[in-house]
From Swiss-Prot:
Organism of origin: Pariacoto virus
Region (Disordered): 1-43
Protein name: Capsid protein alpha
Pfam families in the record: Peptidase_A6
InterPro entries xrefs: Peptidase_A6, Viral_coat
An annotated Gene Ontology molecular function: metal ion binding
Residues that bind Ca(2+) 1: A272
One GO cellular component term: T=3 icosahedral viral capsid
EC code(s) of this entry: 3.4.23.44
Basic residues bias: start-end ranges: 1-16
GO biological processes: proteolysis; symbiont entry into host cell via permeabilization of host membrane
Length: 401
């Protein structure tokens, strides 16, 4: 018994040394087993499932569905620009009576402070002069009597459009209306032209002196015959459309001060087409031309028809105020860069038709959500309850299909 106990104690005291054989590893190119797992990065899920920022979503709302979010002022354009900006959103609502036996042209051009330009001509005639209708906030944002007072060029250095939209909502009696509405887009641009003019001051009376003038190009696209890409429908159906950025990436534009924008090239005996400030510029002047398309509405009213409608226009503009401007105190830091919002914008702008009827306007944001779903694969990119509900299950899109 004693010997057994001693043997057990001796065994317990023995130090057991074990050696582990090293197994040679094959080169990476010759391995056949599963690849070793890499450590998961903390932000890997965010990279795989990017989400729109709040500023990016506000930008898309203002760009494509301004009527659905009229009280949302927007937060600017979430691109690579960094600085102080002032974002404003204008809305104009007016009742329009269309003259029988005429073609009425409503031109919504990216001129800061102006809701639209209007011209009335005989049926089939070529319009030449379009008189502007300013927004009610023109005096607040750009100064009243800007021809002789403080113009916009003294308050802001540059501007750019985030969005511009227009809707025609007929209010005619169903038994009295007649006619049609056509909608299309044109590209207008300002160019510099060096023109000779006779001056009575310098260098001497009667001597020609060159000066640089701003002229407009593209007005010939506003004509009686609509281009191939257009929306055509009955007047009673109305129409809604929006403009989109036609520059590289929301380029900043300079402010100017002009009483009119006239064509630079007039062919043959044609009359020069022009955009005019109302009242000869005593209260307002044309402030510039922005970076988005121009919207053209042509309403044809036959003899005996009684056509009336509500015309609404919206725009979202981003401004760079001068530090000595009274509006500088209302400016804020530009929104952070959101590449997903910009990618969605450039994909969305080419997927929608030129225009839709006014009754389809009420569900336009739902159409934007459907296209977002096609682009991103899931609506979970949208922050807030919408993204939470739709993550992984696509239920929201199914509700709107």
């Amino acid at each position: 018994m004693v010997s057994r106990t001693k043997n057990r104690r001796n065994k317990a005291r023995k130090v057991v040394s074990r050696s582990t054989a090293l197994v040679p590893m094959a080169p990476a190119s010759q391995r056949t087993g599963p690849a070793p797992r890499k450590p998961r990065k903390r932000n890997q899920a965010l990279v795989r499932n990017p989400r729109l920022t709040d500023a990016g979503l506000a930008f898309l709302k203002c760009a494509f569905a301004a009527p659905d979010f009229s009280v949302d002022p927007g937060k600017g354009i979430p691109d690579n620009f960094h600085g102080r900006t002032l974002a404003i959103k204008d809305c104009n609502t007016t009742s329009v009576v269309f003259t029988p036996n005429t073609d009425t042209y409503i031109v919504v051009a990216p001129v800061p402070g102006f809701a639209y330009f209007r011209a009335e001509v005989a049926v089939g005639a070529q319009p030449t002069t379009f008189v502007g209708v300013p927004y009610p906030t023109y005096a607040t944002n750009f100064g009243a009597g800007s021809q002789n007072g403080l113009p916009a060029v003294n308050n802001y250095s540059k501007f750019r459009y985030a969005s511009m939209a227009c809707g025609l909502y007929p209010t005619s009696n169903m038994m009295q209306f007649s006619g049609s509405v056509q909608v299309w887009r044109v590209d207008l641009n300002l160019s510099e032209a060096v023109n000779p003019a006779v001056t009575a001051i310098t260098p001497a009376p009667g001597v020609f002196a060159n000066f640089v003038d701003k002229r407009i190009n593209g007005l010939r696209g506003i004509r009686p015959l609509a281009p191939r890409d257009n929306y055509s429908g009955n007047f009673i159906d109305g129409a809604y459309t929006f403009a989109f950025d036609k520059s590289t990436d929301f380029e900043w534009c300079d402010f100017v001060r002009s009483l009119e924008f006239s064509e630079s090239n007039v062919l043959g005996a044609a009359t020069a087409m022009k955009l005019l400030a109302p009242g000869g510029g005593t209260d307002t002047t044309l402030t510039g031309l922005g970076n988005v398309n121009t919207l053209v509405y042509k309403i044809s009213t036959p003899t005996g028809a009684v056509n009336t409608a509500i015309l609404r226009t919206w725009n979202c503009i981003e401004l760079q105020p001068y530090t000595d401007s009274a509006l500088f105190q209302f400016s804020g830091v530009s929104p952070p860069f959101d590449p997903l919002a910009l990618e969605c914008y450039h994909n969305l702008k080419m997927r929608f038709p030129v225009a839709v009827s006014s009754r389809e306007n009420s569900k336009f944001w739902e159409g934007v959500l459907r296209v977002l779903n096609q682009i991103s694969g899931t609506l979970s990119v949208i922050p807030g309850p919408v993204g939470t509900i739709s993550a992984g299950v696509h239920q929201l899109t199914g509700m709107y299909m």
